[in-house]
């Protein structure tokens, strides 16, 4: 197909859907197909982990998926799940041999919940904190320090630099309707 000829020089695909994609079997079938490609070093997706891990990993495996290439970016939403449930989903993925990292938006009112999440996540699962775009104010010094204790890389979120397209030659972006652009 067309994707195989487009993707050869790139080495990795990350699916960042609008909404939760991994509840749909066809995403797992597609990730499995991509993971079988010799030119692919990694395939992954962003998810809120609201799917049945055992069932979906079975679909991935039945479609020839190579789990050593699978990556999961798990996004924690405290209004949608609990710290113990989210951490257990991460633990299941890690136990299955899947690389996973967690991310959450740096909402100041959620600081205590995010501290608990950091403490509860299994070893091998880092927690990234993203700057809250809708905060409409600067983080206080205390908030910055609190988020930095959770995620030492949070400082990069505070001083966002413009993308440098010349650093990303030949990258593809797939629109929601399936169109690909460079």
For the regions a language model picked out, list residue spans one by one:
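Radical SAM enzyme [4Fe-4S]-AdoMet core and its adjacent flexible, acidic
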Residues: 67, 71-181
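Core AdoMet radical
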Residues: 1, 8-24, 34-55, 63-86, ...
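Generic structural signal for well-ordered alpha-helices
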Residues: 3-4, 28-32, 57-60, 86-91, ...
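Short, flexible, glycine/charge-rich loop motifs used to bind or transfer phosphoryl groups or to couple energy/partner
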Residues: 3-4, 62-63, 161-163
């Amino acid at each position: 197909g067309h994707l195989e000829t487009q993707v050869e020089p790139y080495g990795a695909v990350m699916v960042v859907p609008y909404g939760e994609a991994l509840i749909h079997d066809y995403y797992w079938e597609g990730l499995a197909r991509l993971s079988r490609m010799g030119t692919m070093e990694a395939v992954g997706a962003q998810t809120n982990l609201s799917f049945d891990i055992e069932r979906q990993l079975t679909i991935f495996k039945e479609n020839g998926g190579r789990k050593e290439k699978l990556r999961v970016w798990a996004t924690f939403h405290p209004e949608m799940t609990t710290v113990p449930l989210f951490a257990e989903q991460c633990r299941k993925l890690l136990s299955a041999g899947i690389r996973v990292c967690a991310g959450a938006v740096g909402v100041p009112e959620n600081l205590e919940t995010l501290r608990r999440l950091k403490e509860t996540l299994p070893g091998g699962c880092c927690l990234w904190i993203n700057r809250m775009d809708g905060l409409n104010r600067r983080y206080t010094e205390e908030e910055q320090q609190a988020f930095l204790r959770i995620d030492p890389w949070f400082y990069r979120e505070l001083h966002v630099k413009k993308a440098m397209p010349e650093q990303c030659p030949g990258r593809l972006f797939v629109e929601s309707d399936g169109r690909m652009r460079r």
